[in-house]
Amino acid sequence: VGSLYLTEIRPLQELGTNFANVLGAVTKAKEILDIPVYQGGSDFPENHDIELRSVRFSYKVNGSEGAREGGLGRDGKTDVLQGVNLKIRDGERMALVGRSGAGKSTIIELVSRFYDVQEGEVLIGGRNVKELDYDTILKNVAIVFQKTFLTRDSVLENIRMGSSASLEEVRAAAKEAQIDDFIMSLPDGYDTKVGSFGSRFSGGEKQRIAIARAILKNAPILILDEATSASDPENQMEIDKAIQNLCKGKTVIVVAHRLSALKLCDRVAVVENHTITSVGTHEEVRRKNAYYRKAWEDYEKARNITYRLEGGAGNA
């Protein structure tokens, strides 16, 4: 029986497993192929202000529009955003703050045209993003995500990301990102191969490589999605300086849980209850928004406790 199982039955079981894997891959491929082609023009506006007008959005799967309206596994039972109005001026740095799941990341997905709104408009330079094709938006919007993905290629190619930039141009971007010295210390410098998912680099080092990418791209609109989340005390100063260099002369949206990141921003928008409830300078929003005021009070208490502990340790 044992011999029969090994020679006849087990191969059939393995065949069934392989067939199931193939079906799963085909299903995934179909989801990708069903994503609609972005339509629109390639003439990007010279003015880079951003506006959301009466925006409503949910991740509801909708027949032929599939992934365009959320075919990425979100249940779509309720609107993520309702009646959202926000104006970000050309060259301004705007922070989006709010609890996890409030809709901050959804706003930047709509600005980047990862999805289209169900109601309302998203405008760049007065033009509806639906009038712009995706390649045009991709060239003019740079995003530094919370988690940096590195390919199993050289450090040079991970920064260049398919562009024709020279080594000198890549190094100039890396210097602004405060990562050039680290790269030059690697065994093969910029030709050093990156391990699987960047395993040989710390979170802060990967973050600065992502910032170097964005500096090299030099897009007029910049989105920082929790861009300081991977930093640690040893490289926080370098990341702060890198982000300051990156933000120069750009329209910037900052999504942040760390309130310390708000020092980069001109104004703050609070996202809660599926909409934007307050917009203004830090002091204005702190006066009029209970959530924001409480968040800052908690942050300051925690910071004071940390300072006291560090002081006590130093006096011990």
Task: Provide a role label for each language-model segment.
Residues 38-40:
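Active-site phosphate-binding and catalytic loops of NTP-dependent enzymes
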Residues 35-36, 115:
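Two-component histidine kinase transmitter core
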Residues 20, 43-46:
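Residue-level detector of secondary-structure boundary/capping sites
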Residues 45-316:
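ABC-type nucleotide-binding domain
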Residues 32-35, 161:
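Coiled-coil segment of the histidine kinase dimerization/signal-transmission module
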Residues 5-32:
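Cytosolic ends of transmembrane helices, especially the final helix of ABC transmembrane type-1 domains
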